[in-house]
């Protein structure tokens, strides 16, 4: 099995990249892909850049160039579920766009024409992630993760997301674009991220302060998940 891992930012990939054995770097389309072995398992780790276009471009290049069997999206996210605090883990069962609106033509809010309203994560990957969470004794929530090209740190943006997606557990800027590409390529995916902030008016301050905490937690989760997928 070859496992594809995608993070947007340097801070979100550096801990995993440093552990890759026989590492090679591919620079393509503004993205960097690091290939090699993580604890003996073949992986391809992508640093995509921030936002939906960068994530979709990077995911496409990763899938075409490296042919991974599954995709794990890692990194940080803003917490929406009331039980979440910094460092907690969120696992997607579905991903949706929070900034797409074609409702004038009868689509659901967040749905693009020709696409499902939401992109379902793979059940086996979800189960494997939850097994790792239990093993590591981490606090985690599974549910809907929403994505858009905005960092949510104000009451207006937050209220709009809560109105349109009251069940959403976390918000960030890449996961749904990655899920969209995986859907088109028929490649299983799951989003496993750590909370860096609670999406409120102070979230930009919390993000800067706690990004390293989120990166450490999400990297630990992904490393454990890779081992689980490779060895059971």
Swiss-Prot record:
- One record GO biological process: purine deoxyribonucleoside catabolic process
Q: Which SUPFAM superfamilies match?
A: Purine and uridine phosphorylases (SSF53167)
**Pfam families on file:** PNP_UDP_1 (PF01048)
Q: Which reaction does it catalyse?
A: S-adenosyl-L-homocysteine + H2O = S-(5-deoxy-D-ribos-5-yl)-L-homocysteine + adenine; S-methyl-5'-thioadenosine + H2O = 5-(methylsulfanyl)-D-ribose + adenine; 5'-deoxyadenosine + H2O = 5-deoxy-D-ribose + adenine
Top-level taxon: Bacteria
Per the record, its GO cellular-component terms are: cytosol
Tell me the pathway.
Amino-acid biosynthesis; L-methionine biosynthesis via salvage pathway; S-methyl-5-thio-alpha-D-ribose 1-phosphate from S-methyl-5'-thioadenosine (hydrolase route): step 1/2
CDD domains documented for this protein: MTAN
Q: What is its EC number?
A: 3.2.2.9
- Which residues are responsible for catalysis? 12, 197
Which GO molecular function terms does the record list? adenosylhomocysteine nucleosidase activity; methylthioadenosine nucleosidase activity
Membrane keyword on record: no
The job of this chain, per UniProt, is described as:
Catalyzes the irreversible cleavage of the glycosidic bond in both 5'-methylthioadenosine (MTA) and S-adenosylhomocysteine (SAH/AdoHcy) to adenine and the corresponding thioribose, 5'-methylthioribose and S-ribosylhomocysteine, respectively. Also cleaves 5'-deoxyadenosine, a toxic by-product of radical S-adenosylmethionine (SAM) enzymes, into 5-deoxyribose and adenine. Thus, is required for in vivo function of the radical SAM enzymes biotin synthase and lipoic acid synthase, that are inhibited by 5'-deoxyadenosine accumulation.
Q: Which family does it belong to?
A: Belongs to the PNP/UDP phosphorylase family. MtnN subfamily.
Q: What quaternary arrangement does the UniProt entry report?
A: Homodimer.
- State what protein this is by name: 5'-methylthioadenosine/S-adenosylhomocysteine nucleosidase
Organism, by scientific name, is: Citrobacter koseri (strain ATCC BAA-895 / CDC 4225-83 / SGSC4696)
């Amino acid at each position: 099995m070859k496992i594809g891992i995608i993070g947007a930012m340097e801070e979100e990939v550096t801990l995993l990249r440093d552990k890759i054995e026989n590492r090679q770097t591919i620079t393509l389309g503004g993205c960097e892909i690091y290939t090699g072995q993580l604890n003996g398992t073949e992986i391809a780790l992508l640093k995509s850049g921030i936002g939906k276009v960068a994530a979709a471009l990077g995911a496409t290049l990763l899938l075409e160039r490296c042919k991974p069997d599954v995709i794990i999206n890692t990194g940080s996210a803003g917490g929406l579920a009331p039980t979440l605090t910094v460092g907690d883990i969120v696992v997607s069962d579905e991903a949706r766009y929070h900034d797409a609106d074609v409702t004038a033509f009868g689509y659901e809010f967040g749905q693009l024409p020709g696409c499902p309203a939401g992109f379902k994560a793979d059940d086996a990957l979800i189960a494997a992630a939850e097994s790792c969470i239990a093993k590591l004794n981490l606090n985690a929530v599974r549910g809907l993760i929403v994505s858009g090209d905005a960092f949510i740190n104000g009451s207006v943006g937050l209220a709009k997301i809560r109105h349109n997606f009251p069940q959403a557990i976390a918000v960030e800027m890449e996961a749904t674009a990655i899920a969209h590409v995986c859907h088109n390529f028929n490649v299983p995916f799951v989003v496993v991220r750590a909370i860096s902030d609670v999406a409120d008016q102070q979230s930009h301050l919390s993000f800067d302060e706690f990004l390293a905490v989120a990166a450490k937690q999400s990297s630990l989760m992904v490393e454990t998940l890779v081992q689980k997928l490779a060895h059971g």
